[in-house]
A protein has these predicted regions:
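Active-site glycine/GP-rich loop and adjacent strand/helix microenvironment
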Residues: 7, 13, 21-254
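Short hydrophobic beta-strand segments
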Residues: 1-6
């Protein structure tokens, strides 16, 4: 597990660092590490070293980071003309959103650059949507998409055209069964039917020691199958998210 994040010890109040720490404890190998800190930002050379070690050992890698952490590292890697070919079975999770205070990063551009630099197919890249107020998270089910076949897309082979279409549709985020999602009218807070965009509200039964119902200023819509399609922040809402925290940390170094 390689995380382009500060460690939980360095950032004890970051829910994302804490989550990554749990992943390292559960699935990490001895060389798992955190590759960012508030003083130095993302450690580009150390990321490269860790990726090269994984390739030499043919050890699959789980990469974790925010969108802006990946952009920061990609700028370093592209300046160095660095290219990697990650071992089969590797995965990448990005989170935190693509809009920052200083610029907007189109998602297709980020994924294209990650694919070119890491040699990782796009259907091995997963977006996570969550927040510190919720214990549960929502993920895109692209790693195993039932629509792609009985076995799903469980390996690194390129999907067929039919599977590719199914995987494209599976970019909608899916919630665990104990996390309820409602889309509300911004003016009346009345529930909206599938297909209409409104404010996102959650009821997380995993929040046993805190408030279970959370109303956000995020916009989205539900499809007919319960998939969540994110539409950004409500007009006038304060920008927030893990990517912004990393962006602020990186800007402080410049």
């Amino acid at each position: 597990v390689l995380a382009l994040l500060p460690s939980p010890e360095v950032a004890p109040h970051s829910s994302l660092s804490r989550m990554a720490g749990f992943a390292v404890e559960r699935w990490g190998r001895p060389r798992s590490r955190f590759l960012a800190d508030p003083d130095a930002g993302v450690d580009g050379p150390s990321v490269r070293e860790a990726l090269d070690e994984a390739r030499e050992e043919a050890a699959p890698v789980l990469l974790l980071g925010t969108a802006f952490a990946w952009v920061h590292w990609l700028e370093w890697a592209e300046a160095q003309q660095y290219r990697a070919r990650l071992p089969e079975g590797s995965r990448l999770m990005e989170t935190g959103g693509f809009k920052g205070r200083s610029r907007e990063i189109p998602r297709d551009e980020l994924y294209r650059r990650l694919q070119e630099t890491l040699g990782l197919p796009r259907h091995r890249m997963v977006n996570e949507y969550g927040m510190t107020e919720l214990l549960s998270q929502m993920y895109e089910p692209v790693l195993v998409a039932p629509e792609a076949g009985d076995e799903g897309q469980r390996d690194d082979r390129a999907p067929t055209p039919a599977q590719g279409a199914a995987l494209s549709g599976s970019r909608a985020h899916r919630a665990p069964p104990w996390l309820g999602i409602r889309v509300l009218d911004p003016e009346t807070l009345e529930p909206l039917p599938p297909g209409q965009v409104g404010l996102l509200s959650f009821m997380d039964l995993a929040n046993v020691a805190s408030v279970s119902a959370v109303l956000t200023e995020d916009l989205g819509r539900l499809d007919s199958e319960g998939g969540l399609h994110l539409q950004g922040r409500a007009p006038g809402a304060e920008p927030r998210g893990c990517s912004l925290a990393l962006e602020e940390m990186l800007e402080a170094q410049s």
